[in-house]
Amino acid sequence: MNETILVKIITPLSIALERQAKMVTIPGEDGMFGVLSNHATMIVSLKAGLVQVYIDDIYNPQITYLVSSGVTEVTGSYVNIATETAINVTNLSEAEIATKLQGLQKPLSEQH
């Protein structure tokens, strides 16, 4: 399977990621879901969690981003993930990722 899909992670300030991938897994409001090329078109609410991008194969993610809530647009050729926050956590430990995720999940009233 050589087909790829364009994955974009977009925040209000920048495009955090834009690259071709074999697969991407995304934290939707109804649970995690995976997207390969030629996926059915859909719009999905995004919840805070990990977006894993599989570049070389569909078994080991090479890039991982921690994202806040937002929206995901999926088509057969691309995935646009629009989120308030996107943090590249590829090289962080599980404990560091868990701490950052807790910060994203706090209600806004607790963050100020």
From Swiss-Prot:
Molecular function GO terms recorded: ATP binding; proton-transporting ATP synthase activity, rotational mechanism
GO cellular component term of the entry, any: plasma membrane
The protein's role, per its UniProt record: Produces ATP from ADP in the presence of a proton gradient across the membrane.
Family annotation (CDD domains): F1-ATPase_delta
Annotated family: Belongs to the ATPase epsilon chain family.
Sorted UniProt keywords: ATP synthesis, Cell inner membrane, Cell membrane, CF(1), Hydrogen ion transport, Ion transport, Membrane, Transport
Primary residence: membrane
UniProt xrefs under HAMAP family: ATP_synth_epsil_bac
Descriptive protein name: ATP synthase epsilon chain
Transmembrane segments: none
InterPro entries: ATP_synth_F1_dsu/esu, ATP_synth_F1_dsu/esu_N, ATPsynth_dsu/esu_N
Compartment(s): Cell inner membrane
Keyword Membrane: yes
UniProt feature coiled coil, ranges: none
Topology within the bilayer: Peripheral membrane protein
Subunit structure: F-type ATPases have 2 components, CF(1) - the catalytic core - and CF(0) - the membrane proton channel. CF(1) has five subunits: alpha(3), beta(3), gamma(1), delta(1), epsilon(1). CF(0) has three main subunits: a, b and c.
Pfam families reported in the protein's UniProt record: ATP-synt_DE_N
